[in-house]
């Protein structure tokens, strides 16, 4: 068996270069960590694999400074090779360039008619799946499994995507992706309910929930915002109303303990709202976008981490927030609402408010932060243990590999 992992990860050797050439110096940290978790799992399971990456970047000249994304090749282990394709980043030409290079690299790999090839695609982007579908048509020994982390319909939740003409192109992309589902042999989902929106996945899916990728975090950042005489809550994620951060900030503002601090990392349409609240309440610290390593350090040093998303939108039934695994693995206790996409067993390790009101969240903040330090430490450690032992890269990728061979 040979595995080809089609991804959008950033090779570590050129990650700095890619970040520097993004107009906003912003790389997609959460998807990158998930994908490197898959790669490390393939390495640990000693699988013969090609990691084929088309780094997730914006187009030139609006979002990326270079006309062409540089190629990079490396050997990650005896069995695993990495090819990060170089492609044309110019707006309008990018999809065709990526599609052509994907097809070229995969066709060069699937040369043995007696070998079974399993392509695991992290993305459902249509121009990344299109060349695989064409290759499958002429190679009976090539099989396609797709990791679905989010439903394509969710793209329209972001305000920037709701404007014309972007909305038109996104709707067309959604239609194309749904047509491509019929060509996918197996689906790897983060929530069992996703099959309600992807009927093609019924009877041929594996629910993964998430993956804990043990990052090599160096204590390279001075955490001056976290002090031993203060109780710090951390939120790191998208700064959008649907994420619940606006309401959580309002709930925090209703608390009065001067030793409380709320650190917020991220970017999005609610930044102006958060910045205004930070002016009104000096306990709120808005950091904006931050490097992933810095965020991980903050998670481990904070008193409490929070996912403030509420179950008042359909998306929460069909998703498993990536931060859940990362937060619970940090050893820091977590507070959040009951979301349908998260199995009930996770909530034994979390604090949850009594209802969805801002007042209830404010009361829960006071309740949790009033608990003795040893109770909070015990809560965090009990949550951490099963994540690190059962959701680590080797275990989760092992499940995927067994599923592919069923």
Task: Give short role names for the model-derived ranges.
Residues 36-38, 134-138, 152-154, 164-187:
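Membrane-proximal helix-turn-helix segments that form the acceptor-binding/catalytic region
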Residues 4-6, 212, 225-243, 249-252, ...:
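Conserved donor-binding/catalytic core segment of Leloir-type glycosyltransferases
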Residues 348-359, 367-373:
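Conserved acidic donor-binding segment of nucleotide-sugar-dependent glycosyltransferases
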Residues 158, 199, 206, 211-230, ...:
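Acidic anion/phosphate-binding donor-loop and adjacent secondary structure
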Residues 55, 62-64, 170-205, 212-214, ...:
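A short, active-site helix/loop in glycosyltransferases that binds the activated sugar's phosphate group
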Residues 243, 293-295, 305-326, 335-346:
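Nucleotide-sugar-dependent
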Residues 272-297, 304:
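Nucleotide-activated donor-binding/catalytic signature segment of Leloir-type glycosyltransferases, i.e.
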Residues 1-68, 250-253:
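N-terminal subdomain of nucleotide-sugar transferases
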């Amino acid at each position: 068996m040979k595995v080809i992992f089609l991804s959008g990860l950033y090779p570590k050797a050129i990650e700095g270069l890619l970040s520097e050439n993004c107009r906003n110096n912003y790389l997609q940290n959460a998807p990158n960590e998930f994908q490197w978790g898959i790669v490390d799992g393939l390495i640990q399971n000693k699988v013969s694999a090609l990691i084929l990456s088309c780094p997730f970047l914006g187009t030139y000249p609006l979002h990326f400074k270079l006309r062409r994304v540089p190629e990079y090749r490396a050997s990650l282990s005896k069995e695993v090779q990495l090819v990060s394709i170089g492609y044309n980043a110019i707006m309008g030409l990018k999809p065709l360039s990526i599609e052509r290079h994907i097809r070229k690299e995969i066709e060069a790999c699937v040369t043995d008619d007696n070998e079974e090839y399993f392509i695991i695609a992290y993305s459902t982007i249509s121009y990344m799946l299109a060349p695989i579908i064409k290759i499958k048509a002429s190679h009976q020994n090539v099989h396609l499994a797709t990791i679905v982390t989010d439903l394509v319909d969710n793209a329209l939740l972001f305000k920037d995507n709701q404007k014309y003409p972007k909305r038109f192109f996104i709707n067309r992309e959604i239609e194309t992706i749904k047509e491509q589902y019929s060509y996918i042999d197996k689906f790897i989902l983060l929530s069992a309910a996703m099959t309600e929106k992807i009927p093609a996945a019924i009877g041929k899916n594996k629910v993964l929930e998430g993956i804990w990728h043990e990052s090599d975090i160096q204590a390279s950042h001075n955490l001056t915002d976290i002090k031993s005489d203060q109780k710090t809550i951390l939120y790191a994620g998208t700064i959008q109303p649907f994420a619940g951060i606006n309401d959580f900030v309002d709930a925090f503002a209703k608390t009065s303990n001067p030793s409380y601090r709320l650190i917020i990392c991220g970017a999005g349409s609610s930044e102006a709202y958060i910045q205004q609240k930070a002016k009104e309440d000096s306990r709120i610290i808005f950091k904006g976008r931050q490097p992933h390593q810095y965020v991980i350090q903050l998670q481990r040093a904070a008193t409490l981490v929070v996912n403030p998303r509420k179950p008042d939108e359909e998306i929460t039934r069909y998703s498993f927030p990536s931060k859940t695994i990362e937060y619970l693995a940090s050893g820091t206790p977590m507070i959040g609402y009951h979301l349908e996409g998260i199995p009930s067993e996770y909530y034994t390790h979390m604090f949850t408010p009594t209802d969805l009101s801002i007042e209830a969240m404010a009361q829960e903040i006071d309740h949790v932060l009033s608990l003795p330090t040893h109770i909070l430490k015990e809560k965090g450690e009990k949550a951490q243990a099963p994540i690190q032992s059962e959701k680590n890269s080797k275990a989760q990728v092992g499940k995927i590999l067994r599923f592919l061979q069923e």
